[in-house]
Structure formats: structure tokens, C-alpha cells
Regions:
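Canonical AAA+ ATPase core
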Residues: 32, 66-72, 92-166, 175-178
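Hydrophobic positions in the central parallel beta-sheet of the AAA+
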Residues: 47, 88-89, 128
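Walker A/P-loop
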Residues: 9-47
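Conserved C-terminal "switch" segment of AAA+ ATPases
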Residues: 41-42, 136-204, 208, 223-228
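Pre-Walker A (pre-P-loop) alpha-helix and adjacent loop at the N terminus of AAA/AAA+ ATPase modules
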Residues: 1-15, 218-219, 223
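AAA+/P-loop NTPase substrate/partner-engagement loops
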Residues: 37-67
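Short loop/turn elements that form and flank the Walker-type P-loop nucleotide-binding site
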Residues: 11-14, 40, 55, 81-84, ...
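The Walker A (P-loop) glycine that initiates the GxxxxGKT/S ATP-binding motif of P-loop NTPases
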Residues: 21, 91-92
Length: 232
């Protein structure tokens, strides 16, 4: 809703969000939830900047100039052409090099960019979500005031509460069960959240570990169910 309102009242062409916080606390999950609302039938456009700290990082992102030895196609143009999603997820943004920062400084201002082959990409009406593992108080050490001012919205996620962890267990378990019942109705019959997953969330500190435990418990239940049916 904020995204749609923002597009109507602000002149900035791109709605951009910077989400900071420790690893595994749900930054990517927030991006996927937003993507599922706007482009549920398309794969999310995701670029991990863990590999974008080298001197030629910008070439890897938008492509190498014509005639450049060892030319690269460019990950961003390639994924924009492959997916109609309106959500772009930039993961581990703090690891990008200066050239990449400058590229996004211009992109967030103008709403479009030109790749190395001269093709123009208009990203008006897109959402770009930048995630970073840096704590809120360190943001200014990595990003310039000019770049920070370009973001439409900035937030920092803290550690999960017990209530939030339990809500996440319910949400992910229901999501997995829905897929199971859709693809394997015979196996999924009579499976409910209450009788398939039992997690002491106090033992886990982030969503990633909780999700892994959910999948492990579901796999155990499904394996036992399949084995029991085969023995009947």
C-alpha cells in the first residue's frame, strides 16, 4: 500500500527500501512477501552482491563494453529480460564496490539505466529492496549521505521475539503444507500444522535456522507416512 501511495505523490521514479540487520532475521523474507503481493507468478529478480566487490563489478552487473576482452553479459539486464517481476532484491549491498554504489546513486535518481550494449531499461514502477547485514549504527560508514538520501524507506530489523518466532513457524508450516497437499494429495491428507511440527523456538535465534528445523520435521513426518503406506 505504501508503495502504491508513494508512486502517486512522490516524483522519485523507483520505490527503494534499505533493510539492515543481522543475518537470518528475515530481511529476504520481507522482500519475498512484498514480491508475492506484486508479482506472484514471476520469479523474484535477485542479485547477491557478495560477488560484486572487485574492480570490474560494474561490468558484471550491467555488462562489459563492446569489444572488451572477456566480455560479460551483465546479470541485471539478463534477469530483467527473463522475469516480469516488479521487485528487485539486492542482497548484501554493503559488499558492493564504489562503482556499483555510484551506479545505484544514478539509477535511484533517474529511474533508468543503459547497459553496455546501449539498451535502455526503464525501472519506473519497480521496487528495489536492498538488504545488508550491517547494523543500523554502521550504515553511515559504508554508504554516503547522498546514497542514503535516495532510499525511499530505511528500516533496521532487530532480533526476533518469541511471539514472532512462533508466528513464523505457523506461517512457514502452513505454506509448506499447502504445497504438499496440492502436489501430493494422498500424502498430505490429514496433515495439519499442529500434528506435523513441534519446535521450541527459544532454541533458535533466526528465521533461517527455524526454517531448516521446520523442513527437517516435515521431511521426517512425510518419510514415515510414505513408509507406512508402502508397508500396508
Amino acid at each position: 500500500i505504501k508503495y502504491r501511495l508513494f508512486n502517486k505523490i512522490d516524483q522519485q521514479p523507483i520505490f527503494s527500501v534499505l533493510i539492515c540487520g543481522h543475518s537470518g532475521i528475515g530481511k529476504t523474507e520481507v522482500a519475498r512477501l512484498m514480491h508475492n503481493k506484486l508479482s506472484p507468478n514471476e520469479p523474484i529478480i535477485k542479485i547477491n552482491f557478495g560477488n560484486y566487490s572487485s574492480n570490474d563489478a560494474l561490468n558484471s552487473l550491467i555488462g562489459s563494453p563492446r569489444g572488451f576482452i572477456g566480455s560479460k553479459k551483465g546479470e541485471l539486464p539478463d534477469k530483467l529480460m527473463r522475469s516480469k517481476s516488479k521487485v528487485i532484491l539486492i542482497d548484501e549491498f554493503e559488499k558492493a564496490g564504489k562503482a556499483v554504489y555510484n551506479f545505484f546513486l544514478q539509477l535511484l535518481e533517474e529511474g533508468r539505466f543503459t547497459d553496455s550494449q546501449g539498451r535502455e531499461y526503464d525501472l519506473n514502477k519497480y521496487i528495489i529492496i536492498f538488504t545488508s547485514n550491517m547494523p543500523k549504527e554502521k550504515v553511515g560508514d559504508y554508504l554516503s549521505p547522498e546514497l542514503l538520501s535516495r532510499f525511499s524507506y530505511k528500516c533496521a530489523l532487530g532480533l526476533l521475539s518469541e511471539r514472532e518466532k512462533n508466528e513464523y513457524v505457523q506461517y512457514k508450516t502452513q505454506k509448506y503444507l499447502k504445497k504438499i497437499k496440492s502436489k501430493y494429495p494422498a500424502i498430505g491428507e490429514n496433515l495439519e500444522t499442529s500434528n506435523i511440527v513441534n519446535i521450541d523456538v527459544s532454541l533458535y535465534h533466526n528465521m533461517r535456522d527455524i526454517n531448516n528445523e521446520i523442513m527437517r520435521q516435515i521431511a521426517d513426518v512425510l518419510y514415515d507416512k510414505v513408509e507406512m503406506e508402502e508397508n500396508e
